[in-house]
Amino acid sequence: MDQDAFILKEDSEVEREAPGGRESLSDVIGFLDAVLSSEPTDIGGDRSWLHNTINTPQGPGSAHRAKSEGEGEVSTPSTQDNRSGEESRVSGRTSKPEAEAHAGNLDKQNIHRAFGGRTGTNSVSQDLGDGGDSGILENPPNERGYPRSGIEDENREMAAHPDKRGEDQAEGLPEEVRGGTSLPDEGEGGASNNGRSMEPGSSHSARVTGVLVIPSPELEEAVLRRNKRRPTNSGSKPLTPATVPGTRSPPLNRYNSTGSPPGKPPSTQDEHINSGDTPAVRVKDRKPPIGTRSVSDCPANGRPIHPGLESDSTKKGA
């Protein structure tokens, strides 16, 4: 008796621990019985009940047990309608190419705005492969209202009127250096293009405000005359022989400040100037003015000699 009671007790505990397992098995058995008991003519009937959502307290995915198996109600697992999910996937697939095409159009517009307004003979064609019209305007309207730079306007004006540059040169007006693309050549080999074809195109369009003026002979002469007026060593003192490096000055005599020996008369500036063309005039032949005496008239003993007595002695000796 005790063993039987113990076995029944264990069976009840096992049933409490795993009630879901028995319910699932019973649901499967009931579903099979209902399918087998159904008539073949009901298979082609209305199946709209299969798509109806079954509200069960046990949650989605669990089998629903019929109230009574004898009433002919079929117990089916709860399923959700997946039509909305499939439609959303299809709509997502169709919208993806449209989004890519829209992004491609935006990229084309951005590229045109970045390089818009630049025209010239060597500009790259904007047609995409097939040579047809790409749908991008050559001169798009200013939609955002941003002010355009003056460089682009000048380039457009010069490209539209190439004869204006020749008129400026004929009138003698200085030609302003402009940045941007090069203009078409007016002569053979671009010789008369004034070097525009060699200018590199810059993205920032830095404008040069200076003008190029060709110097004339009169202007060069005026510049040379102005430079001659300026002193070469302004504010610098002339170097004396004593201060010149590498030279030695002879000792000066107390009677002769020019550095010449006592028996030789001092050399003057006139002797150096006239030494090439005319014979030099010696200082000895010159007569000093009245009231003055020369340094050479003083002998070594310090006694002065009157010039008249010296001339008389020479005459008597002659």
From Swiss-Prot:
Residues 50-59, 191-206 have a biased composition (Polar residues). Residues 1-23, 38-318 are annotated as: Disordered. Keywords: Phosphoprotein. The modification Phosphoserine is found at S68, S125, S192, S249, S257, S260. Residues 7-20, 83-101, 150-168 have a biased composition (Basic and acidic residues). The keyword Phosphoprotein applies. The keyword Acyltransferase does not apply. The P/V/C gene has two overlapping open reading frames. One encodes the P/V/W proteins and the other the C/Y proteins. This is Protein W. The gene is P/V/C.
